[in-house]
Amino acid sequence: RGIISSYQAFGLNILLAAPTGRAAKRMTEATGLEARTIHRLLEAKPPEGYQKNEENPLEGDVLIVDECSMIDIVLMNALLRAIPPHMRLVLVGDIDQLPSVGAGNVLRDLMDSCVCKVVRLTKIFRQAQSSRIIMNAHRINEGLMPDLSNGKTTDFFFTEKEDPEEAVAEIVNLVQTKLSRYYQTPSSQIQV
């Protein structure tokens, strides 16, 4: 919202996009502005391709694209071809999330290339900073062993089971009791 507000202060026309419908919906909810899928933004018309391209570029001053780690090389190529020279492009994403299903790891490659300005955010807002899931994810990224200890008031659980049936029983117990209690959510609302 801060980036959007800054551009709006200069009267710039902002486009918002994301690779999936779910991500676009979250972006709309978070910003109060309409976000579209990249395919919809580019006016995909299979099998011909995209209506928005070099000859018929996007209209606007700024394009902000969220969840960029999910964008493969083919879709990013189509997107970049549709951006006119004057348009500013802001790519938002987490390179530590799963990469795109299609070919390429575009966001990571762009960040590693050093050809564009990169800003890394280090403060976590989605979950409490006391989250052991987040803490252990950071430890793993730093090449450290995660804290595998268990407790009653934690969002991180580690268990080892050799027998597949015991593993299934432990997962069921985890969902029905531990996670349900920790998140104060019915087990029917927890996805595994």
Report the location of each language-model feature:
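Conserved RecA-like ASCE P-loop NTPase motor core of nucleic-acid helicases/translocases
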Residues: R1-E29, A35, V90-V92, D155-A167, ...
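Catalytic P-loop NTPase motifs of RecA-like helicase/translocase cores
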Residues: L42, I71-D72, L98-P99
